[in-house]
């Protein structure tokens, strides 16, 4: 039986209209190409978010936008972390400063609102200090758009299902590896996992990857899919209970950014510099200091 196509970029207009009529929900997956150990594809974050969103839309309805692989890194605490966990290896990053990523997100919200979606689920597989900032931006935008908004950042797994009680293993640990293995098996190769401490820290690899489990990952992905389904249903109910608003223009978004969001930037977690940063000879030093702009 052929799969129902839910990927926006692969659908023709009548398919999009039919999917919209069935369930006017849109998934917006975000991520980053960055080090995730020598055993995982560098696009892990967006791959997980996109593939899991596709599963949710296939099972319960909705449309999935193309994954956005440009995300926040290098500045402030991100740069300090990368100096310690990646070092001078070529990182293969697709990084943006935080203000550019967050402003782009505002335009993504405007676009799906203009199309008439009732709910938008923003799923960022890439986490960091911005996990505190994205909800603040969405709270501002929510006051100006009809589409109801929900965001999830990180693995999105509501519980660790590993039976040994050791947890998910942190960044690029067994939790992320297990989830990626479940949805994109060609993007995980455990034979590449280092067997000793030579050249540590192993391209930012996390803990317990030797106990990664694809079958367990499928159970965990099912958890996430059902969570997304429940949130989507709540968004539709919230939309139906409100009066619609006028669609925003590009100029409207610029005004909202300049008057409501930009003044908040100095307080955003992703804009903080709370340490002395990488040493002067580190490749991570150049963008560590956060400029006063945006």
What is each of the regions a protein language model found here?
Residues 1-121, 125-294:
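Extended, histidine- and acidic-residue-enriched regions that form the cofactor-binding/catalytic faces
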């Amino acid at each position: 039986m052929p799969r129902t196509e839910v990927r926006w970029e692969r659908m023709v207009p009548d398919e999009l209209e039919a999917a919209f009529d069935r369930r006017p929900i849109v998934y917006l997956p975000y991520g980053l190409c960055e080090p995730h150990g020598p055993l995982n594809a560098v696009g892990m974050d967006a791959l997980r978010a996109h593939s899991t969103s596709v599963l949710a839309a296939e099972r319960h309805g909705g449309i999935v936008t193309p994954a956005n692989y440009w995300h926040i890194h290098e500045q402030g605490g991100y740069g300090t972390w990368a100096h310690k966990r990646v070092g001078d290896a070529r990182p293969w990053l697709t990084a943006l400063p935080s203000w550019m990523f967050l402003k782009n997100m505002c335009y993504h919200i405007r676009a799906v609102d203009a199309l008439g979606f009732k709910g938008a689920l923003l799923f960022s597989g890439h986490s960091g200090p911005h996990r505190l900032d994205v909800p603040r931006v969405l709270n501002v935008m929510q006051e100006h758009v009809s589409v109801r908004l929900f965001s999830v950042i990180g693995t999105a797994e509501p519980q660790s299902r590993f039976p040994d009680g050791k947890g998910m293993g942190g960044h690029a640990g067994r939790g992320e590896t297990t989830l990626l293995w479940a949805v994109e098996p060609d993007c995980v190769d455990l034979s590449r996992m280092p067997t000793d401490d030579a050249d540590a820290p192993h391209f930012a690899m996390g803990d317990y990857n030797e106990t990664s489990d694809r079958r367990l990952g499928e159970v965990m992905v099912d958890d996430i899919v059902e969570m997304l389904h429940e949130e989507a249903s709540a968004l539709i109910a919230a939309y139906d209970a409100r009066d619609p608003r006028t669609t925003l223009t590009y100029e409207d978004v610029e005004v909202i950014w300049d008057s409501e969001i930009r003044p908040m930037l100095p307080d955003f977690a992703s804009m903080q510099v709370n340490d002395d940063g990488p040493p002067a000879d580190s490749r991570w030093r150049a963008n560590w200091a956060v400029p006063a702009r945006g």
